[in-house]
Amino acid sequence: MQGTLSVWLAKRGLVHRSLGFDYQGIETLQIKPEDWHSIAVILYVYGYNYLRSQCAYDVAPGGLLASVYHLTRIEYGVNQAEEVCIKVFTHRSNSRIPSVFWVWKSADFQERESYDMLGITYDSHPRLKRILMPESWIGWPLRKDYIAPNFYEIQDAY
């Protein structure tokens, strides 16, 4: 089953894949990295002018990384807001996704945090640098295959 936004995008020939609905009935769409910036601009013009949040996660060790965007369209008042979740998957070996900073300014620190923790490079982001970890930090701490430097696990401490 496709949601209204998925049907609207399909009518206009915009490539995407519906991943279904979450427990709140919000549709989740998958967009390819190379299509993401143009579809983001189209969604903004269509009325999704509020980026509620952006996050990223490691799908599986050695697998894909995902950048997730929660967008809201407030056309008929806050009580009737439309929401959509967009997922953009990228390979960890070349984790590059177009930045949507120039579409939604609120993506600034959120994309920087995703870069800092997972190493996803957001192309055309004006200030893409570490935001939580020191600049000298090596690696991406939230990747499932990350090994912390000088970290020793103590077994049976008691």
Swiss-Prot record:
Return any one Pfam family short name. Complex1_30kDa
Keywords of the record, alphabetical order, are:
Chloroplast, Membrane, NAD, NADP, Plastid, Plastoquinone, Quinone, Thylakoid, Translocase, Transport
- Top-level EC class, please? translocase
One of the GO biological process terms: photosynthesis, light reaction
Localization, UniProt:
Plastid, Chloroplast thylakoid membrane
What is the role of this chain? NDH shuttles electrons from NAD(P)H:plastoquinone, via FMN and iron-sulfur (Fe-S) centers, to quinones in the photosynthetic chain and possibly in a chloroplast respiratory chain. The immediate electron acceptor for the enzyme in this species is believed to be plastoquinone. Couples the redox reaction to proton translocation, and thus conserves the redox energy in a proton gradient.
For this chain, the family text in UniProt reads: Belongs to the complex I 30 kDa subunit family.
Protein name, UniProt field: NAD(P)H-quinone oxidoreductase subunit J, chloroplastic
Instruction: Tell me which domain of life the UniProt entry assigns to the organism this sequence originates from.
Output: Eukaryota
Which sequence ranges form a coiled-coil region, renumbered to this chain? none
Q: State the disulfide connectivity.
A: none
